[in-house]
Structures are given as structure tokens and as C-alpha cells.
């Protein structure tokens, strides 16, 4: 049976002419390429091709005068001063000298960057020359330059009030009660001041529950939606506890190792992450929440020059963010000791196992000098926790609390999911039409399955005149960081990515995720669409579907239905047909997302929980949803219907949201 959208090829330009998408802002014409135009790595050695142009008029190339790699602190300080930090004074800036910067400011851990500014090793040295009696809970003098750099960017979102409708479930013995505001739990002057500087007004659901659990020194396994504020959920209570307790034996061990020529660092807290990008993002968040403290965060990851990372470590390290492979390397070189590690965090734990890091993780946690479970405080965070991961938690966690916050990866309120039938041969044309309709300030993330496909699609878009970039596993660390910075800054508002970017990347203002190639499993789909709609922002996820994606049909339908998304009838028909054919093989009829959660606590044999926090989702259903596709079955109303007919699965504007920024 051939499932062909019969009108897909008819008059795309004419169909879009009537969509009133503010065509003046969406013209594809432009002038010839300027000297400053970003050129993809695989095209840099080619002779310039005639006809390349920048879309200055449509916003594809940034018109900002500011250099893309300039400091975050370039904007004026219009926040107003924190009421928690009342001792600001201009004379304090002398404590922070200028840091040497790498080319990619905001990425962290490279060049001569020391994280918070270097200090001379004299009487004012901050990191390890202080005595044990120093009060780590008191804030150090401020630095206006550093404050502006750390806190000048970012958007905390506009949709936090809708988080109250997300269901939450906590299981385990004696679960601490959740909080409603950051002030409900004592975290100290430094943390509260930095929360205000970060402009966090209220905790997200995962923060409401995880912060008091961690503050009570309970081990935690948290299954939370992507973009839910997981990083702050563990950094805030860990850092506040370090400020309250001080360095303890770790500082003494570093002093014994040599005051000036120390070679080994003993971090108090260790955060493991699967990818370089996620590790750097966690590190950048740690820099914010350790501002004006004596805690110095560091980051180590593979794919970068190890000598510079060693030199950065030797300046002091209290909180270490690391990828497993590079951390094992540092431990074997004698640069890192885990003897006094009080806090262990495994972020994106399922992804680390998927990537084959289990031997390294067990080497770090079980076969070295790290304190055993019950002595250390351990937390596991992930977007999915299948039973295999939960069983692994038995080895790492002690009397833990299992926390499930919302159904993983998509919320009906924040991410609108659209699925359209597109034959392989038509995908590029469909993509161009989507990009032409996109607002000039919108960031678009396009996912493909292969590295070759990423390069090929970036090459195609580049020749079509779009300012785009790409990221995948074969790119050098420098090229990956440059691509991410070009995307974040808006100079290249289109990022073509493979799965390497699907996990953990926190780019807060991504408006649109496009699955140019759908993944083969639903978990990967969940993580991809989670790149938009992050931390309260509204997002749109569009997926190109055809016969190659039959295997994901049933799970995709289950997810769309549970998220209260509009479902095209052809997808329902395909799911029924595929499910019926596969039923003889024992395929389960229940949704893997049943109950609104991405995972369940395997310890609950009967479904009863020790404690539960829950609230119902918003009851209002999506508009539309009837008569999908009409008599054409899988064809729908052609690509014009992609925007305004039920053949696509609903009208983009049915939510009253202007997705295109016009």
C-alpha cells in the first residue's frame, strides 16, 4: 500500500502566498555573501561559488555589530541589584583580575579561563590557601564585570504557571514535603542572591521536589521531562550544603599535597555527564550559582587538549563536571582523587549507558577511592528510566526516593507536536517551505539520522542561501563549539544535528524542532522534541513521516494521544494496521507512557506508592482533530494543508500562537 500525499507536489508557492505569513519578512532573496559569513567546515577549502547570498533581509544572518564571540556581559546591566547581596562596592573589583579568554566565550574550561577569575597565590588567594576556619557561607565581594558576564543572558520562560498542572509522583520511605518557593528551604545568602541574579522567580516541579529531598541528604533517582530545570535542581542544594559545611578534609588533603605545586585535586562534588556539550552546560550553571563563593567549579571532557584542563584543575577544584572517559584518564594520571567526594550526580544516566559508559562509571564509583553509598550522597537524573536503569540504581543509591515529574519529553501545554507525511524525495522542498515561513528571530533545530546526512543537508541549505551550521560526532571539538555558538547567537539560526545534540543541550529560545529524519525509537524522539519548549517556553515540533518510520507508529500515536495533541487519521490507520499485524508477536497493547510518567518505580509491585504528589493536567483539549485527511487517507490536503488543513493533523494557528514570529 503506497501512502502518498497526492497534492504534495502541487503549487507550493501558490499555496504559501495565501498564508499571510508576513511575506516581507520571509523573502529568500538577498545580496552576495559578505566576508564575515559563516562557512561550514567541509566547505572551507572550496572555491567560492557564485550565487551564494546572505538573507540579511529575512534575518538569517545576524545584523548585530557585536562579534559572535564577545562576552555575555555586553548588554547593559538593567536587572537591578540583588537584595541578597547588599555589600556591592566598586572597590571590590580588584579581587578579580581579567581572565584570559579562549575564542568561544561562554563555553567554559578552555584557553586560560579559570572559571571565576584567577587569583595570585598570596595572602588573598581564594581557592586553597584559606584556613579551615573561614566561613564559606559568607559571600565574597562582588565583581560587576563577572556578574554581567554570568547573568546577562538567558530567558527563564513565559509559561511557568502551566507547570502546576504537571503530575508528580514520589515513592520511597519518608519523602520530604515539596516546596512552593525557593524561600521555603534554607539555602543561604549566596544561593539566594544568585537565584535572584539568575531571575528565577519560582521553582519548577522537579526543583520543588528534588531540592528538599537533596537538602535532607536522601539519595534520589529523578525521572523528569527535558528542559525542566534538572541542573539547578541538584546544583542549588549541593552548593548550599557545601557553603554551609565548608571544605573539610578535602582542603586539608590538598594542602598536604603541596601548597604551590599541588598536582592532585579532591573535589567535594562530582557530576558525570554523557557528552561534552552537556558537561559544559552544567559547568556554566555551576559558575552562576557559585558566584561570590569560595567554591571553584571545573570541567573536563574528551576531545579537548588535556594539558589545559590539567592546568585549570591545578588552580583548584571543588565541584567537578566530567565525562566518564576523560575523568578516568585524569584519575589514572593522578590528577583527581575522589577520596572526599560527598556528592555524586549522574545526569542523563540512561544516555551514558546507551553510549557504553557503564564500565567507566563503575570504575569511578565502585573501584576507586570514592566513599561507598550510604556515606556519599548520590543522585541520578534522566529523562527516561527504564527498568534496567532502575536496577542499576540499586548498586549506586541507598534507600533512595524515586521521583517522576510529568510525562517525559513533551507537555501538552508547552510543546505542540505536528506530524506530516513526506516522501523522501520531497523532504528538502518541504523543509525549505518551513524555513521560509519561520520568523527571522527564531532558532530552528533540524535532526537527521547520519553524519553524512547532516553534512549533505547543511551543504544544501548553505547553497540555498540560508545561514546554517551543523553538529555531529565527527566534528572537532572546536568546530562543534563554534557551531553551537553561531546557533545560540543567532548568526546561524538553523542547526542541523545528529543524535549527539539530542541530549542535554540547553538552548532556551529554540522555537522549532524539525525531525527531518525520524529516529527508530520513541525515546530518541522524546529527547529530540525536548530541545524546544524548555523551561516554560512554548515550542513547536514537526516530524516528517513516511513508510521508513512504520516501526515507530504505535508508540508515536500513544505519545500524541496522551499529550492531547491532534492526530492525523492516516497515522491512526497505520498504527492500527501495524499493531494488528504485530500482535501475534506478543506486542503489548498498553502505552509505555501510561499514567503520564516516563517511568515507574520498579520497587512498586502493585502500583501503590509510599507517597505521591500529583495534580491533574489542564482539561482543555486541543481544537480540531476531526476529519483528518478526508478521503485521501494518508495524503491529507497536500502541503498547503500542512499549515491549515486537517490533512496535516491540525492548524498551526489553532492554539492562538504565532509560531512564525510574524
Swiss-Prot record:
Start and end residues of each stretch annotated as Disordered: 19-144, 601-633
Binding-site list for ATP: 200-207, 224-231
PTM note: Phosphorylated by TBK1; the phosphorylation is required for the synergistic induction of IFNB mediated by TBK1 and DDX3X. Phosphorylated by IKBKE. Also phosphorylated by CSNK1E; this phosphorylation may inhibit RNA-stimulated ATPase activity. Upon stimulation of death receptors, including TNFRSF10B, recruited to receptors and cleaved by caspases. Proteolytic fragments remain associated with the receptors. This cleavage presumably inactivates DDX3X anti-apoptotic function.
Compositional bias ranges of the Polar residues kind: 21-34
Stretch list, region Interaction with CHUK: 139-172
MF (Gene Ontology): ATP binding; ATP hydrolysis activity; DNA binding; DNA helicase activity; eukaryotic initiation factor 4E binding; gamma-tubulin binding; mRNA 5'-UTR binding; mRNA binding
Domain called Helicase C-terminal: residue spans: 414-575
Residue numbers spanned by region Involved in stimulation of ATPase activity by DNA and RNA, nucleic acid binding and unwinding: 250-259
Xref: Pfam families: DEAD (PF00270), Helicase_C (PF00271)
SMART domains: DEXDc, HELICc
Residues of the signal peptide: none
PTM-bearing positions, type Phosphoserine: 82, 90, 131, 183, 456, 594, 605, 612
Knockout or disruption consequences: In mutant males, loss of DDX3X leads to early post-implantation lethality. In mutant females with a maternally inherited Ddx3x null allele, paternal X chromosome inactivation affects trophoblast differentiation, which leads to aberrant placental layers and defective vascularization in placental labyrinth. These placental abnormalities impair maternal blood supply to the embryo and ultimately lead to fetal growth restriction and lethality.
Residue numbers of Omega-N-methylarginine PTMs: 101, 110, 592, 617, 632
Annotated region described as Interaction with NXF1, given as residue ranges: 536-661
Entry note about domains: The C-terminus (residues 536-662) is dispensable for DDX3X trafficking.
Miscellaneous remark of the record: Encoded by an chromosome X-linked gene which escapes X chromosome inactivation (XCI) in females, but exhibits developmental- and tissue-specific differences in escape from XCI. DDX3Y, its homolog on chromosome Y, is located in the Y non-recombinant portion. In 8 to 16 cell stage embryos, expression from paternal and maternal copies of DDX3X is detected. Paternally derived DDX3X is preferentially inactivated in extraembryonic tissues of embryos from 6.5 dpc.
Name the record gives this protein: ATP-dependent RNA helicase DDX3X
Source species taxonomy: Eukaryota, Metazoa, Chordata, Craniata, Vertebrata
